[in-house]
């Protein structure tokens, strides 16, 4: 994942643990005990969460979160802010306007191969622009998900994240925080704990 190496590269402790695990076998179709142990630890850190799902990359984790949220809310449209990988659900924002994602970390993201049926399923808003987010939600009642990073290259304006949470609550919308990059760098448990704003789904 982009920027997820919070322990750096070639960390001796991590390398030894990985090598030991590989020696025990590198392919299993069942959950290993370590997965259960880690899931329990994560839920202890985040008592608002009830379940944990593991993924192999940030992009995959984002795609899984979107699918879970869509199934739960039975609405397909997403208001999105920030960078969330290269899967179809995200890149389809550029079907609406080829520049929709340009202000979200990476400009000129290519959407060739993304089904045209996904057009107008993703709406973008810029960080700290609560008015634009409110406008998106007001205009299209099929928006059932707000998907965003807690913070990247700028701090939230005073009350911004709490306003996002309230917008989600008032409109029956699922709020997803992508903390794949922020991770546990600044706060043990993620940046949402620092700002005291609890999402419905978070990923690290």
What are the language-model segments listed below?
Residues 2-3, 26, 48, 86-87, ...:
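Glycine-rich, flexible loop/turn motifs
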Residues 2-33, 37-56:
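Glycine-rich phosphate-binding segment of PLP-dependent enzymes
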Residues 3-5, 10, 60, 76, ...:
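Gly/Ser/Thr-rich beta-alpha loop segments that engage phosphate groups in nucleotides
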Residues 37-144:
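PLP-dependent aspartate aminotransferase-fold enzymes
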Residues 97, 112-115, 123-204:
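Conserved PLP-enzyme active-site core in the AAT-like
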């Amino acid at each position: 994942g982009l920027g997820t190496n919070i322990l750096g590269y070639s960390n001796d402790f991590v390398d030894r643990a990985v090598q030991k695990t590989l020696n025990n076998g590198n392919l299993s179709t069942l959950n290993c005990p370590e997965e259960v142990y880690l899931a329990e630890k994560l839920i202890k850190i985040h008592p608002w969460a009830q379940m944990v799902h593991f993924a192999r990359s940030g992009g995959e984790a984002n795609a899984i979160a979107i699918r879970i949220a869509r199934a739960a809310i039975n609405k397909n449209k997403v208001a999105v802010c920030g960078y969330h990988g290269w899967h179809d659900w995200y890149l389809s924002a550029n079907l609406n306007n080829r520049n929709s994602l340009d202000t979200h970390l990476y400009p000129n993201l290519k959407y060739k191969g993304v089904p045209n049926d996904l057009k107008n399923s993703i709406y973008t808003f810029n960080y700290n622009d609560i008015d634009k987010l409110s406008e998106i939600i007001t205009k299209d009642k099929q928006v059932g998900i707000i998907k965003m990073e807690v913070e990247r290259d700028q701090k939230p304006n005073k009350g911004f994240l709490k306003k996002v949470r309230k917008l989600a609550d008032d409109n029956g919308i699922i709020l997803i925080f992508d903390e794949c990059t922020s991770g546990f760098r600044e706060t043990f448990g993620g940046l949402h704990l620092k700002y005291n704003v609890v999402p419905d789904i978070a990923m690290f």
